[in-house]
A protein has these predicted regions:
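PLP-dependent class I/II
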Residues: 3-124
């Protein structure tokens, strides 16, 4: 690894030598965000389900019960909810009807995103 400036070297050393506590707290925060997402969806968005996660901060949401086409779902997520999630379509035909959301963010932002998803599905 080539670090050319002193500040970068000091930051790198601090991360390796003193970053364990931050790392562990960040992992716990993301774990709680995953639980928050699962509970929020179960309580507020009954036509959406969350796929159990296997070691990442990217959560798959299943929108099949909404009856929306992949195109309509993408349109509502982008234009109505003003969110940029990963459309399942980019992963192939079997990804249609799914969206992937990053939950490694402040919980207030995650809640706002989930509120927006809930609002675009009202009345279906």
């Amino acid at each position: 690894m080539c670090i050319r400036d002193r500040m970068g070297l000091v930051a790198c050393e601090a991360a390796y030598c003193k970053g364990e506590e931050w790392y562990r707290s960040m992992i716990e925060y993301v774990r709680k965000n995953i639980e928050f997402t699962k509970e929020y969806i179960a309580e507020n968005i009954p036509d959406v389900s969350m796929i159990d996660i296997e070691g990442t901060y990217l959560v798959w949401l299943d929108f099949h019960k909404t009856g929306l086409s992949a195109e309509e779902l993408d349109r509502r997520i982008i234009h109505n909810a003003k969110l940029w999630l990963d459309s399942g379509k980019i992963f192939g035909k079997c990804g249609e009807g799914f969206q992937r959301i990053n939950v490694a963010c402040p919980r207030s932002i995650l809640k706002e995103a989930l509120d927006r998803i809930k609002n675009i599905l009202k009345g279906l």
